[in-house]
Swiss-Prot record:
The letter 'R' in the name 'Conopressin-R' proposed by Kumar and colleagues stands for the eighth residue, which differs between conopressins. One of its GO terms (molecular function) is neurohypophyseal hormone activity. The modification Glycine amide is found at G39. The keyword Transcription regulation does not apply. Residues 40-47 form a propeptide. InterPro entries: Neurhyp_horm (IPR000981), Neurhyp_horm_dom_sf (IPR036387), Neurohypophysial_hormone_CS (IPR022423). SMART domains: NH. This is Conopressin/conophysin, isoform 2. Residues 1-30 form the signal peptide. It comes from the Eukaryota. Targets vasopressin-oxytocin related receptors.
Amino acid sequence: MKCSVLQMSRLSWAMCLMLLMLLLLGTAQGCFIRNCPRGGKRAVDALQPTRQCMSCGPDGVGQCVGPSVCCGLGLGCLMGTPETEVCQKENESSVPCAISGRHCGMDNTGNCVADGICCVEDACSFNSLCRVDTDQEDSVSARQELLTLIRRLLVNRQYD
């Protein structure tokens, strides 16, 4: 059985086209940590390493919980403000970050990120499980004020 030049050309062309389709399929399924669909990179395996989410907000008291969402206990949640710009850098990392906070939401898939606010993969909502006791809130607020004062003193102190 002889293969003509035309048949070889068609076969090569078909192989190249198939290779190109596989390449496009592989790159189209890639996504950043924060904007993947459910079951994407956010579906973290228990054995996969994670890191703490980046600090954000005034004096770094919050944590990034989305590409332009920063939440913290004494802070609440900031969305789309200059303080949240640092959260865009979360998309650049290939290692997912773990949002700290008590579990909340349906099937405990979310985390309490601020007083009364629970965030899951793609949304935040009010949740009574995330309410902070007034005594505990006062203690956290006083501790944050003290740390802020110490930081300012250290920055303003001139060493000889």
